[in-house]
Amino acid sequence: MSRIGRKSIPVPTGVDVTIAGQTVTVKGPKGELSHTIAEPITIDRAEDGQLNVARPNDERKAKELHGLSRTLVANMIVGVTEGYRKSLEIAGTGYRVTAKGKDLEFALGFSHPVTVVAPEGITFSVEKPTLFHVAGINKQLVGEVAANIRKIRPPEPYKGKGVKYQGEVIRRKAGKAGKK
């Protein structure tokens, strides 16, 4: 059995979980998320209020989806209680970010400013001109938006200029050897 899938999911107080067929809806203080569980996997509520994810057999597809389904539901519960946040930093002379309402405007060495529109459920906050945060309740969406922003100007290996995740270590290369 899947070791992750076997674990029961604790449901904290203040979180309402509704199971309707294969659809799981989680409501909490930060919002509401819904997800449809793949077909062979079943989810039910135990007597102690925890959620259990089960699979009918040991087929390869069922094994693959077992741990995944459990983790997705657990991530939804964390999202509606605590939320998710990714921090990104900008390195480079003249590179900066400013908040324009709900959106972000970047100066990243292009001939024009780059504007990133906040999708529904995502909030941006700018701490410094070189440090900003992407936050929301959907872990997948937060990560996707952060990755798309990083993709605008990924860090280059020679000077490290660009947008990177906070704490990310950029593999550096030596420059040209030069003439002697």
From Swiss-Prot:
SUPFAM superfamilies, per database record: Ribosomal protein L6
GO molecular function term, any single one: structural constituent of ribosome
Record flagged with keyword RNA-binding: yes
GO cellular component, one term: cytosolic large ribosomal subunit
Keyword Ribonucleoprotein: yes
InterPro entries: Ribosomal_uL6-like (IPR000702), Ribosomal_uL6-like_a/b-dom_sf (IPR036789), Ribosomal_uL6_a/b-dom (IPR020040), Ribosomal_uL6_bac-type (IPR019906), Ribosomal_uL6_CS (IPR002358)
PROSITE patterns xrefs: RIBOSOMAL_L6_1 (PS00525)
UniProt entry keywords in alphabetical sequence: Ribonucleoprotein, Ribosomal protein, RNA-binding, rRNA-binding
Gene3D superfamilies: Ribosomal protein L6, alpha-beta domain (3.90.930.12)
Any single GO BP term: cytoplasmic translation
Quaternary structure note: Part of the 50S ribosomal subunit.
Stated role: This protein binds to the 23S rRNA, and is important in its secondary structure. It is located near the subunit interface in the base of the L7/L12 stalk, and near the tRNA binding site of the peptidyltransferase center.
Record-stated family: Belongs to the universal ribosomal protein uL6 family.
Name of the protein in its database record: Large ribosomal subunit protein uL6
Source species of the chain: Salinispora tropica (strain ATCC BAA-916 / DSM 44818 / JCM 13857 / NBRC 105044 / CNB-440)
